Regions:
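Surface-exposed amphipathic alpha-helices with a cationic face
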Residues: 70-74, 130, 153
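Alpha-helical elements of Rossmann-like donor-binding domains used by nucleotide-donor carbohydrate transfer enzymes
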Residues: 68-69, 125, 151
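Alpha-helical substrate-recognition element adjacent to the catalytic core
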Residues: 2-119
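Short, surface-exposed basic-aromatic patches at helix termini and helix-loop junctions that form
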Residues: 95-102, 131, 152-160
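Acidic, Mg2+-coordinating phosphoryl-transfer loop and its flanking beta/alpha structural elements
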Residues: 136-164
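Conserved Lys-Pro-Asp/Glu-containing loop-to-beta segment of HAD-superfamily phosphomonoesterases
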Residues: 23, 122-146
Length: 164
């Protein structure tokens, strides 16, 4: 049944465009658009990840296929959000520009929010971003974490979640 509902939503996206209902695409960065740096997803060593998370190392991460889909979505006029649990870095927008990743808004982990879980943080940030549209939007959320996907699916109306 869930697949049928998703197919109906996909077919209705063209109809949404004719009514000027915004289509929002929200993407995680690590493991979704680009290969993650370091081994955090395997060893959950946050201090090691912070040490590995340098501008130089990020320049050489391998692009994943969804990055090209993001570019196509932006060309179609969709609203693009990048939502990452990475600690705030001044150079992250520059990195996205160098990697040719267009976006409308970015959310990184604020330094003061280090202790909140990733799935709760992403849900809060996404709610903040979509709240300006009220109930008039179509949201696609892309993430490689089942926990993040479940949190968004259960906590945000009108979200179509894509686990990659």
């Amino acid at each position: 049944m869930k697949k049928d509902k998703m197919m109906i939503r996909i077919q209705n996206k063209n109809l949404l465009k004719s009514f000027d209902i915004p289509i929002i695409k929200a993407y995680d960065f690590d493991g979704t658009l680009f290969e993650p740096i370091g081994t955090y997803e395997k060893d959950y060593n946050l201090e090691k990840f912070k040490k590995d998370n340098t501008f130089f190392k990020n320049l050489f991460t391998e692009e994943l296929p969804l990055a090209e889909e993001l570019r196509k979505a932006k060309k179609r006029g969709n609203i693009i959000y990048i939502i990452t649990a990475r600690e705030w870095k001044w150079w992250f927008p520059l990195l996205l520009w160098l990697k040719n990743i267009p976006y409308d808004e970015i959310r990184q982990r604020p330094k003061a929010r280090e202790n909140i879980s990733t799935h709760k943080l992403k849900k809060e940030q996404l709610i903040e971003l979509i709240s300006k549209y009220g109930n008039s939007y179509e949201l696609d959320f892309y993430d490689d974490s089942s926990l993040n996907c479940n949190e968004i699916e259960q906590g945000i109306k009108y979200a179509v979640v894509h686990k990659v």
